[in-house]
């Protein structure tokens, strides 16, 4: 009996020591560089957001924040690395809706659950998408486009950057809201998609607004509307699709946020969020993100978590209705 009690006491002491060590590590965090994983190659929207924020975040934390690009599989390789990483605050993710919420709804091979396996830290903001049409398409605005599409079901085509991407889901949401049948043509990149749109090989495309804007401003394409609930400050002359009665339920953007492994210690989450809020309030950071079409709307961990749950629910409805599967 005494031996059992001694063993139990030793176990309790060991647990207490481990807990104290963990608390001490959290209190002094960070003591070394932090890796910020981006699940895409350099040069894309998520990478741009990460590289805009990382230097300033590093200054405030007193440690370097190093970008690690792990491109491939729609961002899921990078997200999976963070899911499996030690929850010590030294491996973080600049996440987006694609790998955090959409991937597991469209791809059975994705084993993690972004809602449960990643800890929301700070919501950064959204980047609007826009529906554009090829030169000469006989529809001057979104209302006329819906009329045209209804008159010839399945004849019009729209392009996106791939099956299961936010651009694809936005296109399907437009179809569902407008009660039209438009054929989806997936592309592997925005460049090829824009080339074929300008050449008239496809009728419509859902693009990130910042990518489409030069073509819109040069009158090379017709802009039918942004996919957000209201007009974008980047292109105030482009209407929101939701301004058209048949499309009033269209409200979607490409979103970005800082995340970590699910069991990231609360003090680390709070410190990161505090410093992120300060970084996102910096005029130079806001200016650079705005130039890329990112509308900064920072939110705390609880708000960000609620946003992810709501968006995942919306994505699920779109995916199931459209039958999207990779």
Language-model features, listed with the residues they occupy:
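Short, low-complexity disordered leader/linker segments with a strong preference
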Residues: 1-31, 143, 326
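N-terminal (or domain-start) structured segment
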Residues: 24-116, 155, 179-206, 215, ...
